[in-house]
Amino acid sequence: MQLKKTLIATVLVLAMGSSWAQADPARAQKIVMGSCFLCHGENGESSSEVFPKLAGQHANYIAKQLENFKTGQRKSTAMADMSSRLSPDEMLALGKYFEAKPSAPEPVEDANLAAVGSYIFHTGNTYSGVPACASCHGKEALGSANLPRLAGQYPEYIENQLKLFNQRERTNDNAVMHAIVSKMTPLEMAAVAAYVSGK
């Protein structure tokens, strides 16, 4: 029995090592400095709210978004072009590169708005049927391997993505998010964005 457990553990370690080997950090650095940094910054802290911060974002989530851009499941002319040159291993390598970078919270400009956002994020709105965002994205808005980290993201970017989900203009991951966001008011969207950006 002990030998069987040891063999299983060894296989898992080797598999993890293989995954990390495929996600070549040197290759990721080269790709970042060749193109990604122009919009997202060398360390994933983009200088404009038009472009999402990638620092601290989950590797699997980044890789999935790149794949969705490449296949056209998520629309963006610029990102479709960039991702068309990437292999799955390179996408994962970029994900791991940015996931390892520290992320800083955005300053809260409207404390009252953020307080409303905190309530919606943690409790939802029972009257309109909006569920608590924390039920999927976590109490600290850190997400999970397959769900995005929202903490520290630009509020303008988050608010815009919520609107795109509502209008079905963002077509990947749309079913669940559209069902939720379609019940939110513009104020609630802005409030949630203000709250999570400051975390």
What is the predicted function of each stretch?
Residues 41-44, 56, 138, 152:
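Periodic glycine anchor positions in long extracellular repeat architectures
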Residues 17-32, 45-50, 100-127:
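Electrostatic cytochrome c docking/interface patches
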Residues 32, 58, 65, 75-78, ...:
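Stable alpha-helical elements in mature extracytoplasmic
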Residues 26-37, 59, 63-64, 118-134, ...:
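Sequence context surrounding c-type heme c attachment/ligation sites in exported
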Residues 9-17:
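Bacterial N-terminal signal peptides
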Residues 47-53, 68-110, 144-149, 166-199:
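Axial heme c-ligation environment in periplasmic c-type cytochrome domains
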Residues 36-42, 94, 130-139, 192:
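The canonical Cys-X-X-Cys-His
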Residues 1-8:
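Bacterial N-terminal signal peptides that target proteins for export
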